[in-house]
C-alpha cells in the first residue's frame, strides 16, 4: 500500500511538464499585471487616482454600470427562465440570436448600435421625438446592456438548470400559483447563481470599451468611463492617468472573480 502511494505521489515527466507550463503561465500573468501596477511611484499613482478626470470616470462608470446591470438582471431572469422551462417554436433560433452579441467583436456591436440609433428609421423617429441616444451618457448604458445581457442570461440560465423542476411542481400542488412557485421556490434556490451573474455582468459593464466608444464617443469629462479614460490618456501620452484607471479596472475584475468563485459554484459564464 505504501509502495502504491509513493508511485502515485511521485511526479512523472507527464505531470511535471503540465505543472511547469501552468506555473510559467501563472508567473507570466502575475508579472504583466504587477509590472503595470508597480510602474508609477506610489505618490504618482495616488495623485493620478485622485485627479478630477479619474474621479469623474470612476463616478460615471459606477453609475452607468449599475443601471445597465439592473436592466440586465430585469431582462435576463424571465428570458433565462423561459429558455430553461418552456418549449416554443423557434427556441433554437431565439437562443442563437440572444447569444449573438457574445460572438461579435465589441466594435462590431458598437457599429450596429450606432446605425440603429443613428441614421436608421428607429434613430430618426427617436430624434424627432426629442430622444437623442448617440454620444450621450444614455448611450453608455445602452452599449453596456447590449453587450453584457447575454452573459447575464447564460449565467442565470445555468443557475435555473441546476434546479429540479419537481420543486416547482410540488409547490403548485400545495396551492402556489406559477408566480408564487417561481418567487418562493425557484428564485431563492437560484440566488447564488444570480449573485454571481450580477457581479460578473457589473464587472464586464464597467470594463466595456469598444461598443461604448462607438455609440457614446470619447469625450473627456462627459462620456469618459474608466476604459475610455485609459484610451484618452494613452492617446495623449498621459501614462500615469492611464495606469491609474487600469489599476482600478484590475481591482474591480479581481474582486468580481473572487465573488464569482465564492457564489458561482456550478455556474457557467460561457
For the regions a language model picked out, list residue spans one by one.
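Short, charged juxtamembrane terminal tails flanking transmembrane helices
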Residues: 2, 263-270
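Glycine-rich helix-loop "coupling/hinge" segments at transmembrane-helix boundaries
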Residues: 211-237
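Membrane-water interface segments at the C-terminal ends of transmembrane alpha-helices
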Residues: 9-42, 52-161, 185, 189-210, ...
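Glycine/proline-centered hinge or cleavage motifs at structural transition points of membrane proteins
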Residues: 174-175, 188
Amino acid at each position: 500500500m505504501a509502495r502504491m502511494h509513493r508511485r502515485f505521489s511521485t511526479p512523472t515527466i507527464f505531470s511535471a511538464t503540465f505543472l511547469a507550463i501552468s506555473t510559467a503561465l501563472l508567473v507570466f500573468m502575475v508579472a504583466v499585471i504587477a509590472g503595470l501596477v508597480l510602474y508609477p511611484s506610489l505618490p504618482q499613482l495616488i495623485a493620478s487616482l485622485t485627479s478630477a478626470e479619474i474621479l469623474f470616470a470612476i463616478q460615471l462608470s459606477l453609475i452607468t454600470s449599475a443601471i445597465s446591470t439592473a436592466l440586465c438582471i430585469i431582462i435576463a431572469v424571465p428570458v433565462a427562465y423561459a429558455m430553461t422551462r418552456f418549449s416554443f417554436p423557434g427556441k433554437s433560433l431565439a437562443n442563437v440570436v440572444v447569444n449573438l452579441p457574445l460572438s461579435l467583436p465589441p466594435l462590431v456591436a458598437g457599429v450596429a448600435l450606432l446605425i440603429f440609433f443613428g441614421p436608421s428609421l428607429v434613430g430618426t423617429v427617436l430624434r424627432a421625438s426629442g430622444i437623442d441616444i448617440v454620444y450621450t451618457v444614455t448611450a453608455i448604458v445602452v452599449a453596456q446592456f447590449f453587450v453584457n445581457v447575454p452573459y447575464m442570461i447564460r449565467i442565470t440560465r445555468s443557475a435555473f438548470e441546476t434546479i429540479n423542476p419537481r420543486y416547482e411542481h410540488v409547490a403548485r400542488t400545495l396551492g402556489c400559483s406559477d408566480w408564487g412557485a417561481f418567487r418562493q421556490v425557484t428564485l431563492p434556490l437560484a440566488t447564488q447563481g444570480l449573485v454571481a451573474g450580477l457581479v460578473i455582468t457589473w464587472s464586464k459593464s464597467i470594463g466595456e470599451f469598444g461598443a461604448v466608444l462607438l455609440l457614446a464617443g470619447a469625450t473627456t469629462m462627459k462620456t469618459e468611463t474608466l476604459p475610455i479614460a485609459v484610451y484618452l490618456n494613452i492617446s495623449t501620452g498621459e501614462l500615469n492617468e492611464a495606469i491609474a484607471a487600469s489599476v482600478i479596472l484590475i481591482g474591480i475584475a479581481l474582486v468580481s472573480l473572487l465573488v464569482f468563485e465564492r457564489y458561482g459554484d456550478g455556474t457557467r459564464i460561457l
